[in-house]
Design a protein with these regions (language model features):
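Mid-domain Rossmann-like dinucleotide-binding core that forms the NAD(H)/NADP(H) cofactor-binding site
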Residues: 134, 143-232, 236, 251
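Glycine/Thr-rich phosphate-binding loops of Rossmann-like dinucleotide-binding domains
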Residues: 92, 192, 259-261
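Cytochrome P450 core scaffold surrounding the K-helix E-X-X-R motif
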Residues: 39-46
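Short structural boundary motif marking the start of a folded domain
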Residues: 1-4
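Glycine-rich cofactor phosphate-binding loops and adjacent beta1-alpha1 units
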Residues: 174-176, 201, 217-298
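Cysteine-cluster motifs in flexible loop/terminal segments that predominantly coordinate metals
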Residues: 38, 86-146, 150
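Glycine-rich beta-strand-centered segment in the early N-terminal region that forms part
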Residues: 20-35, 48-97, 102, 129, ...
């Protein structure tokens, strides 16, 4: 089968690899019909995340059709259409039973203290081959797949693999209640879903902060009040628009290495950041500028 395989920093290849096989009774094979590129993948491409294993298939977002299930998988069958959550969990340890799947004790082969297991990541996370391929092995299929209704197409379903849950739980952790004033910094895909989630939680006012017009326009279309941080100080503006009180909560959907305004980029911190990026990921535009990875959220 074909897969997107990482061989080294800036060395990503579409190549033929062996099809996966079920290696445990809890597993399943899914034929991918859609996959996505997360900005987290740029860390693996650029080398800003360590311990990537050569030959790892990238990707942790996917939708597909179940082709085969292990003997212990009783809730799925061949032909089921599913979305695959990005993290891997056993479903039966104490953490999984209380809903903390990312803290699963059993999924990560590096041990209980190794951290979250997920597809297409570094050695510390498994490693597990990812979902940017034609077929994928799902280790714990009973809890590692979610059935997709026929009326939901792939482009919508794949948002449930990683992006929407990330934005939703950001809003959930902020403990948004009816009428609360919320500020979302960063209006990329995760930020947009954080805005949508805040609306679902009946937030009163939602402020969206970014400097990219298309993203601000999308946030505005969702009903958010937008602030362009390249044109105005977001902290001062938030104070002015809330009578000096500020928002009830702030959701950071950016990370530490986002683009800054032109004014900030000329300052000492901006120069320090640029130097760090050059040292850590010098090959920002390799292969004769055939691709241009941006600053992925951390």
């Amino acid at each position: 089968m074909r897969a997107v395989v990482r061989h080294g920093i800036s060395d990503i290849r579409l190549e033929e690899v062996q099809e996966p096989q079920i290696n445990r009774p809890t597993g399943a094979i899914v034929r991918l019909t859609s996959s996505a590129i997360c900005r987290t993948d740029l860390h693996f491409i650029r080398g800003t995340v360590s311990n990537m294993v050569e030959g790892t298939i990238l990707g942790h977002e996917g939708v597909g059709i179940v082709e085969k299930v292990g003997s212990n998988v009783r809730n799925f069958k061949e032909g089921d259409r599913v979305v695959i959550p990005s993290t891997i969990a056993c479903g039966y340890c104490s953490y999984c039973r209380t809903g903390y799947y990312a803290q699963c004790d059993n999924a990560n082969p590096n041990g209980k203290d190794a951290g979250t297991a997920y597809y297409g990541g570094p050695k510390d996370t498994g490693p597990f081959n990812g979902l940017q391929c034609e077929k994928a092995l799902i280790p714990f299929a009973s809890v590692g797949m979610v059935k997709v209704p026929d009326e939901v197409n792939d482009s919508k379903a794949i948002m449930l693999s990683d992006i929407f849950p990330t934005g939703y739980f950001g809003a959930d952790m902020a403990r948004i209640k009816s009428g609360h004033t919320v500020a979302v910094f960063g209006c990329g895909p995760v930020g947009q879903f954080a805005i949508a989630s805040a609306k679902l939680m009946d937030a009163g006012r939602i402020f969206a902060i970014d400097a990219i017009n298309s993203r601000l326009e999308m946030a505005k279309n969702q009903g958010a009040e937008v602030i362009d941080f390249a044109k105005e100080d977001p902290v001062q503006t938030l104070r002015e628009l809330t009578g000096g009180i500020g928002p009830y909560c702030i959701i950071d959907a950016v990370g530490i290495d986002a683009n800054t305004s032109e004014k900030e980029s000329r300052g000492k911190e901006g120069e320090k950041f640029k130097k760090e990026v050059e040292e850590i990921a010098p090959k920002a535009s390799p292969h004769n500028s055939n691709w241009h990875p941006g600053n992925a959220p951390s």
